[in-house]
């Protein structure tokens, strides 16, 4: 019966759909439905990818980051606690040594949190997730050329001391000894991210030799909005003691600066400092450094730099573009349709390169206090010894 054929066909189709749980068995049965099914399957696959993989992975990445930052906060809090405790005048020698031990231990932990990883991918190193933030061991032969930018806001006051007491022998103490009081010098400075600098380059890229004076350029905007450039004369010294000798000899010009290689400091004369601050200037220091200690941050995560360890295979890293804008290495996860989430945090945004240097200076200050205390105890002991019982010796010891 021709009239019953469509009914039987419809009935067969419905029976097939019920038994197979599928609207169509083959695309040719209904191309429109087939296309819609494929689109639905694709959308469902994407949603499953978001739900089962991307969102949990992003959440885990953020949790690792949060934990690392919380640990860093705890470490800095512990450092502050040690500093507060060390400010007491009632401390004994053993107490200061305990503080020193604690600070040295905390110093090692500071940037270790920056090496935190999720599933083997370091979370603070941008796209280089297979690399660590810090040097994992001492690398005495590794050498970088670094361009580190500073603004006038990076200028800070620092106190320098000279005239350390050197204990003499009993024979020397029996004679009249001329002693000098400890002197304090207060200067503004710009401190580099590293000490033990190999060489500083002048504005033309040429090395300024130790004991010689070169010229650096600084940049500022005048009252009319025009970009201007100024010159700063800088004399290079190998050590802080060498620079102090120059200061005592009157060789620290008010309108110039001194660069100390061992400490990585640009010490500014008073006039030079005022000029930079009043003009709200910026200055870039171009320097080479060879040899990095375990735990120091790698320059490529903070500055424009070039790994020049192998002269035939130099590796250039760009942290800032030609206009001085930071180049971000964001890792984005797709967590929904047309929705992305940046999961990583750049080390330069949360692990300031100055933190380690600050703690190093604290450690040096504690060591100096311990050394001074030991000398006082030694002098007291010497005063009670027969070898130092003479009038001249007693006067010198006092």
Model-derived regions, located:
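Amphipathic alpha-helical polymerization modules
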Residues: 1-138, 395-398
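Polar, glycine-rich mid-to-C-terminal structural blocks
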Residues: 142-189
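A generic structural signal for short, non-catalytic loop/turn and secondary-structure boundary residues
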Residues: 117, 185, 209-211, 252, ...
